[in-house]
Structure formats: structure tokens, C-alpha cells
Amino acid sequence: MDVDIIDEDENPMLHRTDVRFQLTHEEATPSRLSVRDSLAAKLNKDASEVVVRKLDTKYGMRKTVGHAKVYDSADDAKAVEQDHALERNKIEADEEADEEAAEEA
């Protein structure tokens, strides 16, 4: 799987970089986790700092275009991203937020 960076936009207010990328793959569309790991390796970041938001593969093509958010730290990702996005990318949500939700219930 080859990863090519199409565009990078800095977002200093949220301590992240928005990245658009293109994957070239031989088999079926790769999993979100394998894409996250490949993109993190390409950008020299830890995998917990990368959140893959969208993957789009056209029918019959072996190319996938995607959008990811690369944070300065995993804590920044946990503070900004929605819980379902963190779950999809296998990034553990804050335990404090889980405890607060359990207390309210």
C-alpha cells in the first residue's frame, strides 16, 4: 500500500494538521487501522495522534482518497475528537469522561 499526501492544512487553534491523502492498493480497500498506521509512519507520528475521518474508494478502482486529522499529541486528539471517531480509530477515550457519564446515569 502506497500513501501519497495530497494536501496538508495547519490548524493551530486545535493543535492539528488536516491531511488529504491517496492510497494505492492491490487488494480490497485497507482497514482504517492499517491506513492509520501507514499514514502515521509516513508522517513520523505516533498512531494515537492520527484520526482517519474518511476513506472513499470508487468502484473497481485500486485507489482510495481519504481525510485524516493529525494532532500534536494523543491528549489533543482525545480532547477535540468525538467519541465515535476515537472508537473507530481505536484510540482510548478519557477515562474521566467515562466515569462522569457513569455517575450521571
Swiss-Prot record:
Residues 86-105 are annotated as: Disordered. Disulfide bonds: none annotated. It comes from the Archaea. InterPro entries: Nucleotide-bd_a/b_plait_sf, Ribosomal_eS24, Ribosomal_uL23/eL15/eS24_sf. Residues 93-105 have a biased composition (Acidic residues). Keywords: Ribonucleoprotein, Ribosomal protein. One of its GO terms (biological process) is translation. One of its GO terms (molecular function) is structural constituent of ribosome. GO terms for cellular component: ribonucleoprotein complex; ribosome. The keyword Secreted does not apply. PANTHER family: 40S RIBOSOMAL PROTEIN S24. Belongs to the eukaryotic ribosomal protein eS24 family. This is Small ribosomal subunit protein eS24. The gene is rps24e.
